[in-house]
Swiss-Prot record:
Function: Catalyzes the attachment of glycine to tRNA(Gly). Is also able produce diadenosine tetraphosphate (Ap4A), a universal pleiotropic signaling molecule needed for cell regulation pathways, by direct condensation of 2 ATPs.
Family: Belongs to the class-II aminoacyl-tRNA synthetase family.
Quaternary structure and interacting proteins, as annotated: Homodimer.
Protein name: Putative glycine--tRNA ligase, cytoplasmic
GO cellular component: cytoplasm
Region (Disordered): 25-54
Entry EC number(s): 6.1.1.14
UniProt feature, compositional bias: Basic and acidic residues: 44-54
Biological processes per GO annotation: diadenosine tetraphosphate biosynthetic process; glycyl-tRNA aminoacylation
Catalysis performed (reactions): tRNA(Gly) + glycine + ATP = glycyl-tRNA(Gly) + AMP + diphosphate
UniProt binding sites for ATP: 271-273, 281-286, 398-399
Length: 463
């Protein structure tokens, strides 16, 4: 969709929203029927035009997909055996495109920022993901078609229902706003919260068969085992980051025991999606390029932030998303950091560098926005997070995640492994600290506590 079409669609969307608000106001004020019907008429006229644009998107997408398949840019894996959903191969042209993208990525980040590039194994012991939280929290909620056995993501069904419900020209502005809230938060709703709207989504979208209830969690990691006995459980990694965290001490020492430093990694990752869809946008195996930037937690300024501070980006802060009818707006990156929308110069620097990389890659800046995660959708490890989203025929799609993970991962692996994954700071002058120390009188404790004496001594030693 080119810029004029995009502008046209937004104008029509706003017209529909404004007029639906007017309809709701007239209905609430018990206006005369002819006046209310006249107000309803504009949304009904506008919606077919909007649908025509959406139809053009679908036709264009179908033509592109067929061309990419015919020219072997990308095609379904093991197609002679009918393939498996979510698995794709790159042909010669597709592989060349991938290599060119990764080459530019290395030039823009690894080379320019003097990062360490490493390659860690994809097979990972269970203990690693127990520590990181992935075993418990890397899940989606699913339901089952009780007739044909097909599985569906519960949040996708709820989102689809809400989007279709919003197309009803008779819906009130208040109900539309409530549906918008559900759509914005749907991927983060608990099974109980999804159950609150489940009576509207109790049948499968195509077969209309009944669906299981309530939704149950499904872990997205592929489980495996090591060795002949199968007693040591492992997983195929869903992200490359955990290898970098577990090896932190080695990289820190290699960097002269100095902060900050960054570790980059490109590799295959695996996610057992419940219902892969949207072609290459949701697959079960794909290439991920990640950077872990380690910085002093109390010194998150960045020496090169001034290089990107004046960039004006389409940004969608959390506060704006929580207001009805708002869109992303152009903000100066320096201003976004100064106002606290972005929590530090370091995070702001990488937002700016991602923007410059994507523009250099050929992404239209009018179709590129940075969306702030809402508080309820933040990952369990994040203190702040922004997504670079690109507008395509499927709408706004997340392509890059930029998160402040704080010390979550290093602290978790330190506690579980018993190895201190920490950095040390040399102070210009020593800091004197007064500490209350309890020195137990053992000859008094023995008679008083007898067999519990050891437990009492250990309790007194706790800071």
């Amino acid at each position: 969709m080119d810029a004029p079409e995009q502008s046209f669609l937004r104008e029509k969307s706003l017209a529909v929203e404004d007029q639906e608000l007017a309809v709701g106001t007239l209905e609430d004020s018990h206006a005369a029927k002819p006046e209310t019907n006249a107000a309803i008429e504009l949304p009904n006229k506008s919606k077919p035009e909007k649908s025509a644009v959406e139809k053009d998107r679908e036709d264009f997408r179908e033509a592109v997909v067929k061309t990419l398949d015919r020219l072997l840019f990308v095609h379904k894996s093991f197609d002679i055996y009918h393939g498996v959903a979510g698995l794709y191969d790159f042909g010669p042209h597709g592989r060349t495109v991938e290599l060119n993208i990764l080459s530019l990525w290395r030039k823009c980040f690894v080379d320019e920022e003097d990062m360490m590039e490493v390659a860690c194994t994809a097979l990972t012991p269970e203990a690693v993901f127990n520590a990181s939280g992935h075993v418990k929290k890397f899940t989606d909620l699913m339901v089952k078609d009780e007739v044909d056995g097909a599985f569906h993501r519960a949040d996708h069904l709820v989102k689809s229902y809400c989007e279709n419900r919003k197309k009803d020209p008779t819906i009130s502005a208040e109900n539309a706003a409530e549906l918008d809230k559900v759509i914005a938060h749907v991927e983060d709703l608990s099974a109980e919260e999804l159950g609150g709207v489940w009576n509207h989504c109790s049948t499968a979208p195509v077969t209309k068969n009944p669906l299981s209830h309530p939704p149950r969690p499904f872990n997205l990691m592929f489980q495996t085992s090591f060795g002949a006995s199968g007693s040591l459980i492992g997983y195929l990694r869903p992200e490359t980051a955990q290898g970098s965290f577990c090896n932190f001490k080695d990289y820190y020492n290699l960097n002269g025991r100095k902060l900050p430093f960054a570790v980059a990694q490109v590799g295959r990752v695996f996610r057992n999606e419940i219902s892969p869809r949207q072609g290459l946008l949701r697959t079960r195996e794909f290439t991920l390029a990640e950077i872990e930037h380690f910085v002093h937690p109390e010194h998150k300024s960045h020496s090169k932030f001034s290089d990107v501070a004046k960039l004006e980006l389409l940004m969608f802060p959390r506060e704006e998303q929580e207001k009805p009818g708002q869109f992303a707006k152009r903000l100066c990156l320096g201003e976004a950091v100064a106002k606290g929308h972005v929590n530090s110069e370091t995070l702001g620097f990488f937002i700016g560098r991602v923007y410059l990389f994507l523009i250099r890659l050929g992404i239209d800046k009018e179709r590129l926005r940075f969306r702030h995660h809402l508080a309820n959708e933040m990952a369990h490890y994040a203190t702040d997070c922004w997504d670079a989203e690109i507008e395509c025929s499927y709408g706004w799609i997340e392509c890059v995640g930029i998160a402040d993970r704080s010390d979550y991962d290093l602290r978790a692996h330190s506690e579980k492994s018993g190895h201190a994954l920490v950095a040390q700071e040399k102070l210009a002058e020593p800091i004197e600290v007064e500490k209350l120390a309890i020195t137990p009188e053992m000859k008094e404790l023995g008679p008083a506590f007898k067999g519990n004496q050891k437990n009492v001594v250990e309790a007194l030693e706790v800071d």
